[in-house]
């Protein structure tokens, strides 16, 4: 797996940061919203505009507290299970995807569904279906219980085993060691995933790779940007929610790449001034489900403590955009 994937996007470049005197912020680029999150959030906004409140959303549309609270104030109602949605109502499926059984449940309740599953998650679903049809054992590297993993595993429950971490490899048993493939959750740490795959391949030498990288371009790009700046930072602040897999991974990557400390915050107010004691360089990034307004709040908070020099660290240029679900696309003139 390459260290970063730009999906054919031109303009990717590495940025050299010149050292300045005094306190400074290194600001990772890219950061924040990915194409799948942007699409999912806009899907709920457009559904509210088109149909009016309430619009039901199965699970948090994306894993970010601010985004969910903002959409809830606009009229979105977030539920955990399909049977919480009134019969005949409109329901949006979150960016993380759902298992086929959820579509069946929705049809039984005569729900009008809008599927905001990220297309890169849908790609992994299709891979699971394809290899299950060919009777492979599918080893899904991912976090047990995460919505995305539940949805992908649900495509082929008799063929999929979830491998949560490198140590879980010891417990994996397959029917035919020559018909085994690994797939992964899209928001994992690249390094930890590769360690899990290395250990799987030690156990199953003919283990097949996915047709293309399952860890999404945005997850990889954000991790690469953090790796580029972390060695120069005494502290890295990751803006993101605790239930956001890709945001939590950024904290881990920052620590692994050399930052003395790294913390996850939802809001600027979550920053403890004690974190800044003796610090001259703070790195700032944000998870793929984080709107830029929250990053700006963090920069303002840091400026109050003398960190008013902001230097970008650019490792990729993202221009990818996904089309909205057909149910809420604007009508053609």
From Swiss-Prot:
Under CDD domains, the record lists:
lytB_ispH
Query: Which metal ions or organic cofactors does this protein require, according to UniProt?
Result: [4Fe-4S] cluster
Q: Which GO terms describe its molecular function?
A: 4 iron, 4 sulfur cluster binding; 4-hydroxy-3-methylbut-2-enyl diphosphate reductase activity; metal ion binding
The pathway entry for this protein reads as:
Isoprenoid biosynthesis; dimethylallyl diphosphate biosynthesis; dimethylallyl diphosphate from (2E)-4-hydroxy-3-methylbutenyl diphosphate: step 1/1; Isoprenoid biosynthesis; isopentenyl diphosphate biosynthesis via DXP pathway; isopentenyl diphosphate from 1-deoxy-D-xylulose 5-phosphate: step 6/6
- What superkingdom heads the lineage? Bacteria
Q: What PANTHER family is this protein classified in?
A: 4-HYDROXY-3-METHYLBUT-2-ENYL DIPHOSPHATE REDUCTASE (PTHR30426:SF0)
What is this protein identified as?
4-hydroxy-3-methylbut-2-enyl diphosphate reductase
